[in-house]
Design a protein with these regions (language model features):
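Hydrophobic alpha-helical transmembrane segments in multi-pass integral membrane proteins
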Residues: 59-188
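Alpha-helical multi-pass transmembrane bundles of energy-transducing inner-membrane proteins
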Residues: 176-269
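N-terminal signal-anchor/start-transfer transmembrane helix
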Residues: 6-24, 79-83, 286, 290
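Structural signature of hydrophobic alpha-helical transmembrane segments
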Residues: 1-10, 62-75, 128-138, 198-210, ...
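Juxtamembrane/interfacial segments at transmembrane-helix boundaries in multi-pass membrane proteins
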Residues: 50-63, 110-129, 153-169, 199, ...
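Membrane-helix interface "capping/anchor" motifs
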Residues: 20-29, 84-97, 220-222
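Cytoplasmic-side transmembrane-helix entry/capping segments in multi-pass membrane proteins
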Residues: 26-37, 91-105, 173-182, 227-237, ...
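Alpha-helical transmembrane segments
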Residues: 8-12, 31-42, 75, 98-106, ...
Length: 306
């Protein structure tokens, strides 16, 4: 349990370090040490849990309630980030969807937080697939962060050269970009270890906003346009995800993946009601995975440093 908390929270340390570091050498040190620790702990988690079979992890009710409140606050902050950028760049559709998601997030929090202790007793879950995904996130993700240290130096040098030819200067936003990459890792660990759908939704939305900010990294008209294509399509998925959660809650169904699986095999009248939330969650997955007909944002995302 402690290791799962560590994997989720520790990437925030190098993320903060990237924002505070001054100079390439300091950023390299933060990135290499942070990535090395994440990979090492990931391997330890895999060794400890891979042969033990599926496990649910209990969290103290008070702690669980506080973490649910924090996840709701994060959801609202993410909506605020989207709305700020939508207003800044005058994108009407993103503004409308951002308002819808903000209202939905606040309504869902008001519905569920009073009963959060009941629905988040065992919010974390590991099975074989979870462990494989933890390895993928921790090892592959960390290696990407390490590679980005050198890649972003070349990217910035090229950016500065092109700007100089135009008689301009190129701002250095590498600290923010590298911080977003480690924040992305933290959110991915939340996604692959959460049984609680509220927590999973929070991690889901963090990755959505991180992708938006990274796609728009250069602030060129093309980058901004493609970033908004991504955020609009992913917000459609986020709203579908949120609608699915609200449907589950209103109909008295569990807000956990394991609870939904258990209910699906119960053969009760309530089991039939699972069709709608499963469809909504699947729609969210299609947008996130850029599957047809939501695939159009993925090509545009290549304008990001990649």
């Amino acid at each position: 349990m402690t290791l799962l908390y560590f994997l989720t929270l520790f990437p925030l340390v190098p993320a903060l370090g990237m924002l505070l570091a001054r100079g390439d050498r300091a950023r390299d040190a933060v990135g290499l040490i942070g990535s090395g620790i994440i990979m090492a702990v990931t391997v330890v988690v895999a060794v400890m849990f891979f042969g033990t079979g599926p496990q649910s992890f209990e969290v103290a009710p008070g702690t669980s309630h506080v973490l649910s409140i924090i996840s709701s606050v994060i959801d609202v902050i993410l909506c605020a980030v989207i709305l700020y950028n939508a207003y800044k760049y005058r994108n009407a559709l993103a503004t409308v969807l951002g308002i819808v998601q903000l209202v939905g997030s606040l309504a869902f929090a008001a519905m569920t937080l009073p009963a959060a202790e009941a629905v988040t007793a065992t919010p974390l879950y590991l099975d074989y697939m979870s462990v494989i995904m933890v390895l993928a996130v921790g090892i592959v993700g960390s290696l990407i962060c390490v590679y980005a240290l050198g890649y972003m130096k070349d990217f910035q040098a090229h950016d500065e050269h092109e700007a100089a030819l135009r008689g301009q200067t190129a701002p250095d936003r590498r600290p923010q970009f590298l911080a977003l990459m480690f924040l992305f890792l933290s959110a991915m660990f939340v996604i692959v270890t959460s049984d609680n759908l509220e927590w999973l939704f929070c991690g889901w939305e963090i990755t959505t906003v991180c992708s938006f900010l990274m796609i728009g990294y250069t602030r060129t008209p093309e980058a901004i346009k493609n970033a908004f294509t991504q955020i609009i399509l992913n917000m459609l998925g986020g709203i579908a995800f949120l609608a699915g959660l609200m449907y589950l809650h209103v109909n008295g169904m569990p807000l956990t993946i394991s609870g939904m699986i258990e209910l699906s095999g119960a053969g009760t009248a309530q089991s039939a009601l699972l069709v709608m939330p499963v469809v909504l969650l699947s729609l969210a997955a299609l947008t996130k995975a850029a599957q047809m007909p939501f695939h159009t944002w993925l090509l545009g995302a290549m304008v990001a440093p990649t």
